[in-house]
Structures are given as C-alpha cells and as structure tokens.
C-alpha cells in the first residue's frame, strides 16, 4: 500500500487529520509496541513544550542555569507526564504549538505566529482558548491584523495530505462538529461531583437528592 492509499483508508476516526498523519508514520515502524510509539509522539512534543516555556520565561529570567531548571521542571509537571508519556494523549501537541506561537508574537514575528496558531488549530479545537491573547498582542502591535488570515490558511494547508488521500473539504471543515456530536457531555472522566452520579439517573431522584 502506498502513502496515498494509507491516508485514504487510515483517516476514518474523529481525530483530526494532522494527528492521524503522525499515527500513520509511526505505523510504519515494525516489531515495536504501538502504545510506546504513540506515547513517543507526545513525548517529542513535550520537549517542544518545555523549550517554548523556557523561551517565554527567558524573556524575563536571566541565566542559563535558571532556564535549564525551567526546562526540566516543565517536563516533570504532573499534567505533562500523565497526559503525554503516561496516557499517550495529544493535547501537548497543540499546547506546544500555541506557546511557540505566543513566543513568536512577542518577538514580533507576526506571520510565523499566526501560522503556528493555524497549525495548532488543525490538531485541537481547544486552541480557540488561546486566541483571546491575540487582542492584547495586537494592541501592543506584536501582531498585524492582516496576518490573521494565515490562521485559516495554515489550517487548510495542514489538511492537504488528507485531501490527497481522498478526504473532502467538507470533512476538514466539519471534523470538530463531528467530535461535538460524539461527545455530547458537559464533562467526561473529569474530576468533578458528576462522577458520583450514575449515568441516566432519573430526574425525580436527582431532585430528591438535592432538595
């Protein structure tokens, strides 16, 4: 099977195409546990995340020793270790790209920053939570308004291999809507009081408990 055939058959989940490109690449590695390969992808971006945090901190913190400490502390954060290296989740990918984009903006590299934001958006919709930071950056003249068009442009560019593999533009534009329809819960597996309530609890029973 060539790469194009692989893309056409492999991209069929509710993950966004860019993440599936990475999974397709590691699927070529033979005789190695796939769980470790998936986690290796996240761990690679953990390094990028730590570097981005170090660069951002370096705007205020002086001294190579302090930067090394910041780099290593970032890698040892429980949220980083558990989400990536332990669970093999891909949240670190969009987070590292967003923080790198923020650093680029603060360096007044507006175009690069917006491209990175677009790339992050192609991995996870949660990137939108970083976008309000663009307003103060624009007011500070760190980014240029005309460069905002690079965000959707970068997003669509990240979808090109999926188009080549047979996916439609409609799929690229509606993948997040599909996810929203699949996971139609306010909270899923999150540490909250809702975990103490059984799924499908009768409303009258619920009212009785809290009345």
What are these regions (language model features)?
Residues 82, 98-104, 111-137:
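Membrane-interface alpha helices of multi-pass inner-membrane proteins
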Residues 1-107, 138-211:
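Primarily membrane-embedded glycan-assembly and transfer machineries that use lipid-linked glycans
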